[in-house]
Amino acid sequence: MSLLSAIDTSAASVYQPAQLLNWVYLSLQDTHQASAFDAFRPEPTAGAAPPELAFGKGRPEQLGSPLHSSYLNSFFQLQRGEALSNSVYKGASPYGSLNNIADGLSSLTEHFSDLTLTSEARKPSKRPPPNYLCHLCFNKGHYIKDCPQARPKGEGLTPYQGKKRCFGEYKCPKCKRKWMSGNSWANMGQECIKCHINVYPHKQRPLEKPDGLDVSDQSKEHPQHLCEKCKVLGYYCRRVQ
């Protein structure tokens, strides 16, 4: 055994890992050839000792025959191959064995399963300037998006959700025609005179005192036949304040 260990350590120090793997494959191939050769050996006669037991009892010329030398070579190569394969595969795997690899993968799976895609904490709302009035409740201290009277996003059909009349801007999604009206109400649309479909405003501003475009719009006759508010009420909607 001391001779085998000396051979193994000297071989491991001389050969590179790739050469060691080739050596292992060659040794395994030699063992397969030896086992195939043993399959064709004749059956021992009755009363004769097995060749393994009679190996040490042979004459010196029999011990030096090619058959016995091949057995010795295959035995030594098999021992070297097993030792080298154990050392190579232990050094090649960072986990040491397949069981350790499976344990490492399971731990990684559990680690990634714990990671959930959570939205970041909502940043505190920015305070508006001191003189800023909310466009919905007309109080100071918050923007319209933080107004307590505002409906949740997606419920209303118009930007404005109050009860006052607004100045709204419209754009027909079919013909792309744009127009403005000083008779815009919350969740009420106007009919496009070209496509005859109901269009909701994409911009609204409550009317306190008309100015700018609102003044010019006030001088025009209100198209009651196109106003959804007038259709719902059944009379001129501007009388409702």
Swiss-Prot record:
Q: One Pfam annotation, family name?
A: zf-CCHC_2
Q: Which domain of life is it from?
A: Eukaryota
Q: Which organism is it from?
A: Homo sapiens (Human)
Report the residues modified as Phosphoserine.
65, 93
Zn finger (CCHC-type) ranges are 132-149
* InterPro entries, per database record: ZAR1/RTP1-5-like_Znf-3CxxC, Zcchc24_Znf-3CxxC, Zn_knuckle_CX2CX3GHX4C, Znf_CCHC, Znf_CCHC_sf
Q: Which UniProt keywords apply?
A: Metal-binding, Phosphoprotein, Zinc, Zinc-finger
Biological classification of the source: Eukaryota, Metazoa, Chordata, Craniata, Vertebrata
Specify whether Zinc is a keyword of the entry: yes
Q: Name one GO molecular function term.
A: RNA binding
Would you tell me the protein name for this molecule? Answer: Zinc finger CCHC domain-containing protein 24
- Give the encoding gene's name: ZCCHC24
